[in-house]
Amino acid sequence: LLSRPTILEIINSFKEEGIVVNGGFRESTGGRPPQLLCINGDSAYAIGIDFEFPTIRIALANAKREIVGRRKILFKIDTQAEEVLARMLRELEHLLEEFSSVRPRIVGIGVGICGTIRKTEGRSLHITRIRGWEHVELQRILQEKFHLPVYVNNDVHLLALVEKKKYMREDNSDFVYIGIRSGIGSAYMYQNKLMDGVQGNAGYIGHTVLNAEGPMCVCGNRGCLDAYAGELALNRRYQELTNSENESYYTMRDFMKLSRNGDAVSQK
């Protein structure tokens, strides 16, 4: 345990650096009213990139975890790798230009990405859904362009950490998280530790073959889990059942909303 003088020293250093600020006073129960301290949201910022494909979401958040700016890119499914990367960099650049006043206080970029990765190198090895996306040195590219620290990890693994932090009790230390997105992935938490594998690819279940004679998957195999239950498969099936040529892309959350609102096809 930290001693009272040590805690006060840490708090004072945070005040000097502008990380915490006075937040008023609590009602006294006797003696001097206790002073409240708050995180100064403007003290630091971070960029998050949710690289799911065909959707990429970019957000700028402050130290209080409040999103102050965002971008969303929806690609056509046949978009080439070079265009995907170039447009993502361009949108990130535009976001930084819009919030140029806080640029000196941005501490880093975090990327949650689909597909297989080499986490220790910040490299995206392969994304089946993007033509030509092979061994993209995402960490190096972002660091060289924006001169910020960059962290790359599997998107579903990061979502599992969010689920744990926001919605689960502290004693829920063991669980399996299934992420149904444009593809399907999973994450395993054991004794509060994410079992993500040596390079961050544990739980890569979307291309597990369920039926060798099943529907064609984007990976070239038949009957993968993704080909049955991933968002791309659900969108394709929805268009078939509704005889629709609508190019709108529905997420799993969208399908659930449609179902609750009485959409018969979504309910199937």
Stretch-by-stretch model annotation:
Residues L1-N22:
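N-terminal helix-turn-helix
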Residues N22-A46, V150, N154-F175:
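Conserved phosphate-binding catalytic cores of ATP/NTP-utilizing and phosphoryl-transfer enzymes
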Residues P33-G69, Y177-Y190, E231:
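Gly/Thr-rich phosphate-binding beta-strand-loop-beta motif of the actin/hexokinase/Hsp70
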Residues I67, S124, L194-M195:
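Hydrophobic "anchor" residues
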Residues R71, F75-D174:
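Glycine-rich phosphate-binding loop and adjoining helix at the ATP-binding site
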Residues D171-Y228:
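Glycine-rich phosphate-binding loop of actin/hexokinase-like ATP-binding domains
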Residues L225-K268:
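A mobile "lid/hinge" subdomain adjacent to the ATP/sugar-phosphate binding pocket shared
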